Structures are given as C-alpha cells and as structure tokens.
Amino acid sequence: NPNWDECVTAFQKAVAIDGTNPVVLTYLGFSLNAKASLINKDRAAQKALYTEAMGHLERAKELDPNREKANWAYPLYQCYYLVYAANDPRTLEMEKLLKQQ
C-alpha cells in the first residue's frame, strides 16, 4: 500500500515549485482523497482532507477543463459526494461529466 503521507508531502513540494501543473494538482488531490478514506472515526479530520483535496482538484479543473493532461473528474466527484452528498449540484455536475467519458 502507498504511504499517503509521503505522497501528499511529495506532491505538496511539487505544487510549491509549480502550482499551475494540473497533473501534480490532480495527484495531490487524489492522495489527499486516499488518505481521507482511511480515516474511520474522525469525521471532521476526514472532511478537512476532502475539502483540501477539493481545492487542488478544482484548480486542476480550471487549468485543464477538458482533461487533456489530467483526469481530475473522478476524484473531484468523490470529494463532492462525500462532503456535500449525492444530490448536491456540484456532485451531479461531476456525475454527468463522468458519464460523458
């Protein structure tokens, strides 16, 4: 299994060097998602990680809206689903986008 703390740290360093790379932003968001999914008892800590991931994934979406470089859509969908719930407009928008793939 990957060490998600190490992954997050490495991608944070990469984002500090170049915060406009949608691939790095997507991998950072994905790593934060994975780390959050391992938290079972602390819902606030889990939500904080999903929210942090969301920021990076939304930035990747801004930089690469057509997903030509990075596939940020599914991890962003996961964040929206787990933070805002299934019927939130943001979640539904990502779900629709994923079905168009």
Q: Predicted regions span which residues?
A:
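Canonical positions in the second alpha-helix
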Residues: 13-14, 60
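Short coil turns that delineate tetratricopeptide repeat
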Residues: 19-20, 65-67
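TPR alpha-solenoid repeat register
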Residues: 24, 69-72
